[in-house]
Amino acid sequence: MPTRFKKTRHQRGSTFCGYGRVGKHRKHPSGRGNAGGEHHHRINFRKYHPGYFGKCGMNHYHKKKNTTWKPTINLDNLTKLMAKDEAMKAKKGEVLPVIDLLANGYSKLLGNGHLQAPCIVKARWVSKLADKKIRKAGGAVVLQA
């Protein structure tokens, strides 16, 4: 049967509006937020949030990530990192190509072999012999952190 007013309009002035005496139907009967996730809300947490509770593994605070990482490359392999046209320009003495070893996945430059064309090398570590050979060929070394 259609009624003129909604239930809330009918209950205006009745003090409790269908929810019993003072204190009933109020506050947080099942706890706030994630309360009871391992108790009375267990089904919900197990179904929709598996793995929410409990620990897994160990925490290593202030871990230094791989301090021994030092992939090396020799002088004779440096030209492989250069484009062919860059090597030709360097031999003519036009523009020196810049080789960034860190961007290519290397951190240390070793002095085995000979440098075919002068270039500017950016590296984290460079051996004394490699530095000497690069400068002799007319290039330069830039150390990076």
From Swiss-Prot:
Pfam families: Ribosomal_L27A. Residues 20-39 are annotated as: Disordered. GO terms for cellular component: cytoplasm; cytosolic large ribosomal subunit; nucleolus. The keyword Metal-binding does not apply. Keywords: Ribonucleoprotein, Ribosomal protein. One of its GO terms (molecular function) is RNA binding. The keyword Lipoprotein does not apply. GO terms for biological process: translation. InterPro entries: Ribosomal_uL15, Ribosomal_uL15/eL18, Ribosomal_uL15/eL18_sf. Belongs to the universal ribosomal protein uL15 family. This is Large ribosomal subunit protein uL15. The lineage of its organism: Eukaryota, Discoba, Euglenozoa, Kinetoplastea, Metakinetoplastina. The gene is RPL27A.
